[in-house]
Amino acid sequence: MSDILKKIEAYKREEIAAAKNAVPLDEIKARAADQPPARGFYKALRAKQAAGNFGLIAEIKKASPSKGLIRPDFDPPALASAYEAGGAACLSVLTDAPSFQGAPDFLVAARAACTLPALRKDFMFEAYQVHEARAWGADCILLIMASLSDSEATDLEGEALALGMDVLIEVHDEEEMLRALKLASPLVGINNRNLRTFEVDLAVSERLAAMVPADRLLVGESGIFTHEDCLRLQKSGIETFLVGESLMRKDDVTGATKALLTGASDRIAAE
């Protein structure tokens, strides 16, 4: 595990302990059980693919450790609506506060403003967080293989699947890909960002995609800024993308989303 992930795990463990004191596990499980059924994150991505379209997991992200503040005028419900209007299949909402200025309320508000399934984008270490995610309405969780052992990943995946959620397994090298392919989830995200240096290279996705059987749905993550980037990764069998920063920086988020997916101009013609 990188030094960055070790620091994140340390503060996450403290957060989880505090959360358990505030809302015991039994209570958070009850809240999760009271939620309506999940919207079907994986299903929404497959539907885009079946229709011959790129699948976009559009990210609602206020800030990041490497870039600082990304969007000062941060309005999660408005962003969710803009993404949906632009053709996104799903949302990804940061709930981590220390590194990304995220919050659970952002997830709740964004999901309520649209019909898209939503991923809780956070660093998951314990089952408590999985039930917490469902209690907040999340339809999918993220498991980062670089921060989890095989047994931890298996256990967390099992908790999520039992709650009717989907699981996005994130990898960034060959060893993590081999581990991810032993899990049940068909959703595998390839992070093009080196977690040690923060450098981004789309060749990571191109290299690792060759390892993946056709029954898995690959998601390209990080470093995807243009329609041309999408077309490049499509050649490696990747037709689903998780994109945040490049869209978050645009004034016209709906237009930028359409442009990313279709290559159309950012300018939306008057209708």
Curated annotation (Swiss-Prot):
CDD domains documented for this protein: IGPS
Molecular function terms from GO: indole-3-glycerol-phosphate synthase activity; phosphoribosylanthranilate isomerase activity
Domain of life of the native organism: Bacteria
Family: Belongs to the TrpC family.
Entry-linked PANTHER family: INDOLE-3-GLYCEROL-PHOSPHATE SYNTHASE (PTHR22854:SF2), TRYPTOPHAN BIOSYNTHESIS PROTEIN (PTHR22854)
NCBIfam families per record: PRK00278.1-2, PRK00278.1-6, PRK00278.2-4
Name recorded for this polypeptide: Indole-3-glycerol phosphate synthase
UniProt organism field: Allorhizobium ampelinum (strain ATCC BAA-846 / DSM 112012 / S4) (Agrobacterium vitis (strain S4))
